[in-house]
UniProtKB/Swiss-Prot annotation:
This is FAD-linked sulfhydryl oxidase. Residues 1-97 form the ERV/ALR sulfhydryl oxidase domain. GO terms for molecular function: flavin adenine dinucleotide binding; flavin-dependent sulfhydryl oxidase activity. GO terms for cellular component: host cell cytoplasm; virion component. Disulfide bonds join 44-47. PROSITE patterns: ERV_ALR. Interacts with A151R. Its EC number is 1.8.3.2. Its main location: host cell. Induction: Expressed in the late phase of the viral replicative cycle. It is found in: Host cytoplasm; Virion. It comes from African swine fever virus (strain Badajoz 1971 Vero-adapted).
Amino acid sequence: MLHWGPKYWRSLHLYAIFFSDAPSWKEKYEAIQWILNFIESLPCTRCQHHAFSYLTKNPLTLNNSEDFQYWTFAFHNNVNNRLNKKIISWSEYKNIYEQSILKTIEYGKTDFIGAWSSL
C-alpha cells in the first residue's frame, strides 16, 4: 500500500513555514495556485473533494507565514479528525516543525515524516 499522506503533509507544512512574513500579491497568488495544484494532485479523488470543501469553508489566510501555518495545521487536524487519527495542539505542531527545521539546517536531514507519520 502506498503511503502518500505523510509526504504530502510535509510538503504542505514546509511551504507554509517558508512562506513570506510580508508576502506580495504575487506571492499570495502563487500560494493559492500552489494549494489548488496540491489538492488536484492528491491521488485520492475523495480526498480531493474533502480538501476543496475544506478550502471553500475555510479560505486560506495568507497575511504571513504564521497565519498560513495555522491554516495548514487546522486543515491537517480536520483530516485527522475525519480519519479518527490523533489531533495535536498548536504548540505540538510548532514543536514538531520547528525542531525538524533545526535538524534539517543543522544536519541536512529531516524527521518530519517520523514526527507525524502516525497522525
